């Protein structure tokens, strides 16, 4: 085992604070409407230009191991805030730096670190309550647009397109962000349920312009196994032919003789059929087939529940108003499923989301909810260069998370006003002893840090602005973009309550750990003494004349 270096007490904490300051100073320049850019070198390609706090934080790795530990702990603050609310990473970093700096001064002055931590936790809990009390519901499109605009560094076009996407697909809908191919941002909304499996044979195409197979008012047959024998399908095909309606088959696969017969029947016009593979794999495939069944009013033909294809009847088929199959996807519009069954299925999936610990599973389950209850919107980002596109995509992702958080827990006045207003309400808060009260005081003093940083980045005098805002009431604050004072909500400067809350909780939690640190352990730096110098090799003279 390699030898370790151990540092104790104040010497350890000061090294840790240096690391905290390096990371936080790099991140906090991005805060506010007049936040600056940070340029990050990449091992290949052009450098990355960003105003996203968590992107900056993730890139920082320091040479000194003790300083690096401090930086990594603040990085954890940014990641935690990002995981909970998807935004507020810079605010969380600024708060953590302020609490740690004040806290370590108090520890150096002889205060009890554990009591300081209790005081900080008490202050954070009181401020969180105040934020909840200040919060107003975010229901109308204009408020959603304003939240998106603020979170995208005051880019109103981003706010507008996110608000439109939310309006089109509803709160349950899934909105994804992709890199587009033009200069302008585009919004594409998918009606109905879409999954990423297309037609199994190009011979099913009946619309040559769009190269798609379109079925009007079709029956839908769902099977959770491969279909290779056409005899299994004959009873269903005969029933569908008599009803003179098209048929969509979704199965694990349709191959060989079965697929060939379906193609021939379609080309001759006997029965209009299209077939697609079921989406997903394994258990997820079964779940998604069940979703399609609920949406279309079908029964999944599965041997697990004692149903076989040979005995299937038209009653077990679903229906929809329209189905479109392209090479890559299948879209079912207006399935004839029972509304109560769809609602209960959505509730069931939501319960699974609540119980799931995997982010990937949660994302996939949320997509299923969207396909059943809402819709799917895709925002395609446009920009002049790839660099600008990457930077804009990061901002749109942030703005999207912020608007979701706003819809969830409402909005508060932005620009750091909510925290300043909360601390003026609980200025009389006291701890059980003097050290706890000091912890409360230093945490409340740190609540001003985000507003101070926004004002500094805008080139104004922080102390003057903070004092003036403290004297005001309600949503009165400072608009750093214009340099004016006024009602923040009326000026459209809003922050999601969830973002402000999670930033504060993450900062207080990690700052408390750092203040109560008494020893730090790291590997000793390796002594990289090179190989001894081999000296020059003698000349190879005297070899002339060798022809």
Swiss-Prot record:
Pfam families associated with the record: Cpn60_TCP1
Any one GO biological process: protein refolding
InterPro entries (UniProt xref): Chaperonin_Cpn60_CS, Cpn60/GroEL, Cpn60/GroEL/TCP-1, GroEL-like_apical_dom_sf, GROEL-like_equatorial_sf, TCP-1-like_intermed_sf
Residues reported in the UniProt entry to bind ATP: 30-33, 51, 87-91, 415, 479-481, 495
Documented EC number(s): 5.6.1.7
GO terms, molecular function: ATP binding; ATP-dependent protein folding chaperone; isomerase activity; unfolded protein binding
Translocase as UniProt keyword: no
Subcellular location: Cytoplasm
Coiled coil: none
Keyword Acyltransferase included in the entry's annotation: no
Keywords for this protein: ATP-binding, Chaperone, Cytoplasm, Isomerase, Nucleotide-binding
Reaction(s) this enzyme catalyzes, per UniProt: ATP + H2O + a folded polypeptide = ADP + phosphate + an unfolded polypeptide
GO CC annotations on file: cytoplasm
HAMAP family membership: CH60
Quaternary organization: Forms a cylinder of 14 subunits composed of two heptameric rings stacked back-to-back. Interacts with the co-chaperonin GroES.
UniProt similarity note: Belongs to the chaperonin (HSP60) family.
Name listed for the protein in its UniProt record: Chaperonin GroEL
Native organism: Marinomonas sp. (strain MWYL1)
Gene designation per UniProt: groEL
């Amino acid at each position: 085992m390699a030898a370790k270096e151990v540092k104790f007490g104040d010497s350890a904490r000061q090294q840790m604070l240096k690391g905290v300051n390096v990371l936080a100073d790099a991140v906090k320049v991005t805060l506010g409407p007049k936040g600056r850019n940070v340029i990050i070198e990449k091992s290949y390609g052009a450098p990355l230009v960003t105003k996203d706090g968590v992107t900056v934080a993730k890139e920082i790795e320091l040479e000194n191991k003790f300083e690096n530990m401090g930086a990594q702990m603040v990085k954890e603050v940014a990641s935690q805030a990002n995981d909970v609310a998807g935004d507020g990473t810079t605010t969380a970093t600024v708060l953590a730096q302020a609490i740690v700096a004040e806290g370590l001064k108090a520890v150096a002055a002889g205060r009890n670190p554990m009591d300081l931590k209790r005081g900080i936790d008490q202050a954070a809990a009181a401020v969180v309550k105040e934020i909840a009390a200040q919060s107003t519901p975010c229901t109308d499109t204009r408020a959603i647009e304003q939240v998106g605009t603020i979170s995208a560094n005051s880019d109103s076009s981003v706010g507008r397109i996110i608000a439109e996407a939310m309006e089109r697909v509803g709160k349950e809908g899934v909105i994804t962000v992709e890199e587009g191919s033009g200069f302008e941002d585009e919004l594409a909304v998918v009606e109905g349920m879409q999954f990423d499996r297309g037609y199994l044979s190009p011979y099913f195409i009946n619309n040559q312009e769009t190269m798609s197979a379109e079925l009007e008012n079709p029956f839908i047959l769902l099977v959770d196994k491969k279909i290779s024998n056409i005899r299994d399908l004959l009873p269903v095909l005969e029933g569908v032919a008599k009803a003179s309606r098209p048929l969509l088959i979704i199965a694990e696969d349709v191959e060989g003789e079965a697929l060939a017969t379906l193609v021939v029947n379609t080309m001759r016009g006997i029965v209009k059929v299209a077939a697609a593979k079921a989406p997903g794999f394994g258990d997820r495939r079964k779940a998604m087939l069940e979703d399609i069944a609920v949406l279309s009013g079908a029964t999944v033909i599965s041997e697990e529940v004692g149903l076989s294809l040979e005995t299937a009847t038209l009653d077990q088929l679903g229906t929809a108003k329209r189905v479109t199959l392209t090479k890559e996807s299948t879209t079912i519009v207006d399935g004839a499923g029972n509304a109560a069954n769809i609602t209960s299925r959505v509730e069931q999936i939501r319960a699974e989301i609540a119980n799931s610990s995997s982010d990937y599973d949660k994302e996939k389950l949320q997509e299923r909810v969207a396909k059943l209850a809402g819709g799917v919107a895709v925002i395609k980002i446009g920009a002049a260069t790839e660099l600008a596109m990457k930077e804009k995509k990061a901002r749109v992702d942030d703005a999207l998370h912020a608007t979701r958080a706003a819809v969830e827990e409402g909005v508060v006045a932005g620009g750091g006003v909510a925290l300043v207003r909360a601390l003026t309400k609980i200025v009389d808060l006291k701890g059980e002893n003097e050290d706890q009260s000091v912890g409360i005081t230093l945490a409340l003093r740190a609540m001003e840090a985000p507003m101070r940083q926004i004002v500094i980045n805008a080139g104004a005098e922080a102390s003057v602005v903070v004092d003036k805002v403290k004297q005001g009431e309600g949503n009165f604050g400072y608009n750093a973009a214009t340099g004016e004072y006024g009602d923040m909500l009326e000026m459209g400067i809003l922050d999601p309550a969830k973002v402000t809350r999670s930033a504060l909780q993450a900062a207080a939690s990690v700052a408390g750990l750092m203040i109560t640190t008494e020893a730090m352990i790291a590997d000793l730096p390796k002594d990289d003494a090179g190989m001894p110098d081999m000296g020059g090799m003698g000349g190879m003279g005297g070899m002339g004349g060798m022809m």
